[in-house]
Amino acid sequence: CHIGDIDAERSQRGASDMELLSVTMNDGVMPRSEIEGKDNSSEDKSNYKVVLTGDMVYNSMRMWQGANGISPCNGIVSPAYTVLMPKIPISNGYFAAFFKSPNLINEFRKNSQGMTSDTWNLKYPQIETIKVCIPALSEQNRVADMLGTLERRIAKQAHLVDCLKKYKRGAI
């Protein structure tokens, strides 16, 4: 199937009273209020796009770098972002990982338009034509559960490494 068989573009606008969201490379979609740094958003947010919980949001100019994520909450994003809403039942955990997988990121790069990487852009008409192989929902859920377990184990090991480094510094 194609991405367009799974997701449709959401272009609803005009809900400027909703929380402003942002897409980060590492943490996906999150409230802008939780991100350090200057807020470059427009004062007039009437043209900002509506995002609902479970929507995939991506930065059209940085999708080839993996600037995307599944939204954990309702909100609005800059008109520069593309918002995809699921057409079929999907596992958010699976799709969050799938859209950052090296093979799919490579497809995003190949389908982006522009003269140089500084100007590459991937809009919905291009992304909807990308072919993908999607497992059944039950398999998506199993993969997402496994990835979640691995992430938790990695976090525990990272914490252990930090503790050992502190212990080592204290021993010297």
List each language-model region with its residue ranges.
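Short coil/turn segments at secondary-structure boundaries
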Residues: 16-23, 111-112
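Non-catalytic DNA-recognition/assembly elements of restriction-modification systems
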Residues: 1-14, 129, 137
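Short, basic/aromatic beta-hairpin or loop at an interaction surface
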Residues: 24-37
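Amphipathic alpha-helical segments
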Residues: 1, 95, 131-170
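Short, solvent-exposed loop/turn positions at domain surfaces
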Residues: 42-45, 116, 148
